[in-house]
């Protein structure tokens, strides 16, 4: 009985130590990754695509029906469709007919109709030559912006230069027909494209697997528009040159969030971290002189986190000359100007490229041609106005969402 009484006293005394404070759930977006999802693959069945099937040399295009089905089949069901102006389902193994010229009979193509039909819970892959008028493509980008970018989904384009012998339509101001043969010259190969739309993890995973499965020597370009240019996890970073912050765990947050206390509320506080930029496949080149910081601070008020109207948080990326992809990120703030004294404060910092700081990949410009109306100026190894088409797609992302390079989240305990 005495031992039990003594244990009760010890537990009571131990419970009278430092009080664990509780805070509402941290306002972070939930990252959900579905293990399975369906894939919808759409083949452009217009006559201008026929030429990709006629020359067997280094022909990636004729491998696509089986290759795409194989790459996507492990994640869930794979559904095949053909399209011109309308969309039609391909039952059974009829999708394999798209390796032969005979099925390419459609006169009009409408990528916009495919985007409108696309199921945002699926991965959608559109196989096309991106031969769209400015007006048609403007409608496509509008649909993608409203349906995918506004829903925080990801869009990618894969370009593959392929042997080609056939007709190309609507060339120049006179909308002329153009006969083109690449023969067996890789420098004359004509590009076709995969337009890929869906959840961020699904799109990035597809790009990785497609890149790994590329065995032919055909030139291939990748273009990715994602809100997450880096998967770096700040909670795992080692801090250096820490001023007026100390590690704290009185709030007992989960491992995703770093927690700090302040030595003195009246003094400036700062820290630095090393960060290595590891871009995903297809990420646009970045001008690191054109990045900007968005800082938000939320203070606990009862059961809620309320945003503070003003703060002086500063975050700077400093280039480390020892390695091209290595940076120092310095974060600083003045507690009296940024934090609510005596309350828990959640600090969310996003470092993002500006619209001009996110550049088109070099291959996009190299594969693009402008035709001023003279058919003689057309180059069948390139795509008309490709840089303008993909540039407008990039710009449309910035109208609804901002891609981030690095996100730094931490809580300052009272």
Regions found by a protein language model. Name each.
Residues 1-4, 18:
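Positively charged n-region of N-terminal signal peptides that target proteins for export
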Residues 4-13:
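Sec-dependent N-terminal signal peptides
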Residues 16-40, 47-51, 406-414:
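Acidic, polar low-complexity linker/tail segments
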Residues 20-24, 49-54, 87-93, 132-141, ...:
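Extracytoplasmic/secreted cell-surface and envelope-processing proteins
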Residues 27-29, 36-37, 47-77, 139-151:
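…and closely analogous acidic/polar surface helices at protein-protein or active-site interfaces
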Residues 77-125, 132-136, 159-168:
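Von Willebrand factor
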Residues 156-278, 283:
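Eukaryote-biased recognition of electropositive, low-complexity segments
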Residues 240-414:
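Extended non-globular C-terminal regions
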């Amino acid at each position: 009985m005495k031992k039990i009484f003594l244990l009760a006293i010890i537990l009571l005394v131990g419970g009278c130590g430092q009080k664990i404070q509780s805070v509402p759930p941290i306002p972070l977006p939930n990252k959900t990754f579905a293990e399975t999802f369906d894939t919808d693959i759409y083949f452009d069945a217009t006559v201008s695509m026929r030429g990709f099937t006629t020359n067997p040399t280094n022909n990636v295009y004729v491998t696509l029906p089986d290759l795409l089905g194989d790459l996507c089949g492990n994640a869930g069901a794979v559904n095949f469709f053909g399209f011109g102006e309308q969309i039609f389902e391909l039952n059974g193994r009829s999708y394999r007919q798209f390796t032969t010229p005979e099925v390419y009979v459609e006169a009009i193509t409408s990528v916009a109709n495919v985007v409108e039909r696309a199921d945002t819970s699926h991965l959608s892959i559109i196989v096309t030559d991106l031969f769209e008028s400015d007006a048609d493509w403007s409608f496509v980008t509008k649909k993608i912006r409203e349906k995918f970018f506004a829903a925080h989904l990801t869009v990618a384009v894969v370009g593959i230069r392929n042997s080609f012998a056939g007709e190309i339509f609507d060339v120049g101001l006179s909308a002329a027909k153009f006969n083109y043969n690449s023969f067996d010259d890789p420098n004359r190969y004509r590009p076709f494209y995969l337009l890929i739309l869906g959840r961020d993890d699904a799109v990035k995973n597809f790009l990785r697997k497609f890149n790994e499965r590329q065995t032919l020597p055909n030139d291939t370009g990748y273009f990715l528009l994602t809100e997450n240019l880096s998967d770096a996890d700040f909670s795992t970073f080692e801090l250096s040159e820490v001023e007026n912050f100390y590690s704290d765990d009185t709030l007992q947050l989960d491992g995703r969030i770093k927690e700090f206390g302040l030595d003195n509320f009246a003094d400036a506080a700062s820290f630095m971290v090393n960060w290595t930029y590891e871009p995903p496949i297809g990420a646009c080149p970045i001008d690191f002189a054109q990045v900007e910081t968005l800082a938000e601070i939320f203070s606990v008020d009862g059961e809620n986190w309320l945003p503070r109207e003003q703060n002086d948080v500063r975050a700077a990326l400093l280039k480390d000359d020892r390695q091209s992809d290595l940076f120092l990120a310095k974060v600083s703030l003045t507690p009296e100007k940024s934090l609510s004294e005596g309350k828990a404060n959640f600090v969310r910092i996003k470092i993002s490229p500006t619209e001009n700081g996110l550049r088109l990949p070099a291959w996009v410009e190299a594969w693009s041609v402008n035709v001023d109306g003279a058919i003689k100026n057309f180059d069948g190894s390139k795509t008309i106005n490709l840089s303008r088409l993909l540039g407008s797609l990039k710009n449309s992302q910035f109208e609804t969402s901002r891609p981030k390079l690095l996100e730094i989240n931490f809580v300052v305990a009272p």
